Amino acid sequence: RIIRILQKQQVGEEIRDLGLEGQMQKKGTPTMGGVIILLAILVPVVLFARLDNVYIQLMIVSTIWLGLIGFLDDYIKVFRKHKEGLKGRFKVIGQVGLGLIVGVTLYVSDDVLIREKVSISEVGVVTSTVDEGFVSETNQTVLTKDIKSTKTTIPFFKNNEFDYAWFGALFGDYAEEIGWIVFIIITIVIVTAVSNGANLTDGLDGLATGTSAIVGATLGILAYVSGNMVYADYLNIMYIPHSGELVVFIAAFIGATIGFLWY
């Protein structure tokens, strides 16, 4: 129904012919149809996800923030009749601003932690235990603690955990602070790069949503495994408490993109 309304209002895509096969099929596609995708993501998330989860909160803010940038871009193209849409520098400023919000939130939030195994000598800092039969290496009870950390994982490498505090090693007592600064900068780069990557991918009808659905499915698996202590330990993946809730968001995202492809 929303698609029909947009088509009646002639809010459609104008295509510059580049001679690509299937390119002209995108002509007339409702330009502001992204509003439907946003609703299809946000409504299920609000209904089924834990809204007190910091990762869900960040995803809701990111979805609305980037959706607003896309809305302004389409509005300028369609109603202001400026073919270029929102100027590139304003898009980048918006993306960098979002990256800064995400990075700083991950830094200051007490709910953003990783869980590590500890030795018996560190038993004083233990916050939880993994019962016998749940750990693949020793099949014994394992002591763990939740810590604030700048560690990340590097794919395809053995012993692949990397600590951004390494960049601050020369600064002595300020190594951890430098590590968080590097972490926030990298977060900004990732948010900006992924956002622009989606823009660059878009062009043929369904191309961006099709690839996004595949990427979303992969990230959903990783989020589930990383948020499950048993699977994370078995697969030697960093366990991040509460990150499994992201599966709800990703399921809504995949459903929205597949629904878009259907119509």
Describe each region flagged by the PLM:
Residues R1-E21, Q25:
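N-terminal alpha-helical transmembrane segments of multi-pass membrane transport
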Residues R1-Q7, I37-L68, R89, I101-V135, ...:
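Alpha-helical transmembrane segments
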Residues R16-T29, K83-Q95:
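Juxtamembrane helix-capping/reentrant segments at transmembrane boundaries
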Residues K77-K87, G172:
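Membrane interface segments of multi-pass transport proteins and intramembrane proteases
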Residues I147-A175:
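P-loop potassium selectivity filter motif centered on the GYG triad
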